[in-house]
C-alpha cells in the first residue's frame, strides 16, 4: 500500500509500469479519466496537480475559465486489472490552478471538507461509512428515445418471466421467483462464479472485501460486501466497487446497472449506508440509551431524520430513485428509526455487546448517488443534529408496513419525487454550508443541473405506459 508520492514513483519503477491512469469523479458521480506515460508524473504532480480542460465535465467550469488540475492521492494507487498494458490507477481531487485552492464543485474535495468539519467541531475525529450497493446483472439491455418512440427492454437468463421460453439447449428452469432471489444456491444462482471473480478483483484493487450473495429480486440482483472505512476512503472504495463490477460483468458478456428500479413489480436496488463517529480511538455511538445508543448517537439520528427530505437530493438523486421508494418492496418510505427493524429508514443493527460495532444504517440511499456528496451530506446532517440536540422522537418498533393509514399519517415520509427532494434542499441547506463544506454556489448549481438535465427533460417526454392508459381516450 503506497502512502506518499515517493512510494508511488518507486512502485512505477519497480513494477516497470508504463501508463498512469488518473481518475476523478464528475458532478453526477461518474468516474472520468486520462492516461499518461509514466515519465509525466513526478513529485510536483502530487502537490500542484496535472492540468486538464474542465469545461466539458458535467456541471463544472465554463469554457472561458476551464483550466483545472487533477491532484492524485498517493494512498489510492492500484494496478488496473482490466488494462492490457500494466497501468497504475490513482484517484484524484481537483484544484483551481490559478488560486491553488481545492475546487468548490469537486465532489471529492467536498467530502474532505466534511471530514475536516467533523474534526474542527470537536465532536469527533473519525467518521466511518459502510455502503451496501445492490445491482442487477442483465444479459441484454436495449433502450431508445426519439420523437416517435420510447422504450426499454432488459432481459436476464434468471428472469422469472423467462420460465416458459425456448432456450438454446432447452430451458433448464431454476429461475428465481419474484422476491424469492435471496440466498439460493446454484443452479438457481447462476452468478456465483462471476461474483467471486468480482470480489477477488476488488481485493486486487485494494478494497477490503467481505462477502457476496444473490439478492431478493428475480432477474439477476446481487450484492458484494466490503469493509467499512473512513468517509473519504469508503467513497473511493465504492467508486472502485462499481468500476470492478461493471468490467468483470463485461468480461462475461453481461452488463450491470446500479439503477434503483430497472424492473417493475420486484424489489429495487438500494445502497444502505452504515455510519458511526469515533474520537481518539473510542466509539461515540455506544451508550445507555435506546438500543445501547449514546445520547450523541440519538441526536445524530435526529439530524438525519430532520434533514432527510433535503438529504435525498444527494442520496437518491435520480428520477428513478423514487420508483424504488414505494411501499411493498422492502424500501423505507417513512422517516423513523428502530432497532433491527428494516422497514424503518434508520435502522440500528443488532450488534451485541460490542461498543465498536454500534452504528446506524440509513436505508434510503441508492447507488445513483455520488458517494462523496451523499456521505458528506449525511455527516453534515448528523453534526447538525448533535450541535442542536435534535430529538429523533420515539423509536418505531413495529413493522411500518402493517400500520393503518391513520397511524402512517403521523409519520413523516420521504419525498415522492426528485423534484420534491430538490425543493426540500432549496429550503433546507444551512446544515450543509455550515463549516464551509458545501457552498451556496454548489447547491444552486446542483439543483439547476438536476432540473435542467433530468427532471425537466423527463417531463417533456410521453411515457410508454401512458399509451396503455390513454390512447383510446
Curated annotation (Swiss-Prot):
Keywords, alphabetical: ATP-binding, Cytoplasm, Ligase, Magnesium, Metal-binding, Nucleotide-binding, Phosphoprotein
Residue numbers binding ATP: 210, 274-276, 342, 347, 356
Modified residues (O-AMP-tyrosine): 401
E.C. number(s) listed in UniProt: 6.3.1.2
Pfam families, sorted: Gln-synt_C, Gln-synt_N
Gene Ontology molecular function: ATP binding; glutamine synthetase activity; metal ion binding
Residues that coordinate or bind L-glutamate: 267-268, 324, 330, 342, 363
Enzyme class: ligase
InterPro entries for this protein: Gln_synt_N, Gln_synt_N_sf, Gln_synth/guanido_kin_cat_dom, Gln_synth_cat_dom, Gln_synth_gly_rich_site, Gln_synth_I, Gln_synth_N_conserv_site
Highest taxon of the lineage: Bacteria
Compartment(s) of residence: Cytoplasm
Keyword Phosphoprotein (UniProt): yes
Record's catalysed reaction(s): L-glutamate + NH4(+) + ATP = L-glutamine + ADP + phosphate + H(+)
GO CC annotation terms, alphabetical: cytoplasm; membrane
Domain GS catalytic, residue spans: 107-473
Notes on how activity is controlled: The activity of this enzyme could be controlled by adenylation under conditions of abundant glutamine.
Positions contributing to Mg(2+) 1 binding: 132, 272, 361
Subunit structure: Oligomer of 12 subunits arranged in the form of two hexagons.
Recorded family membership: Belongs to the glutamine synthetase family.
Function field: Involved in nitrogen metabolism via ammonium assimilation. Catalyzes the ATP-dependent biosynthesis of glutamine from glutamate and ammonia.
Name recorded for this polypeptide: Glutamine synthetase
Organism: Picosynechococcus sp. (strain ATCC 27264 / PCC 7002 / PR-6) (Agmenellum quadruplicatum)
Name of the gene encoding the protein in the UniProt record: glnA
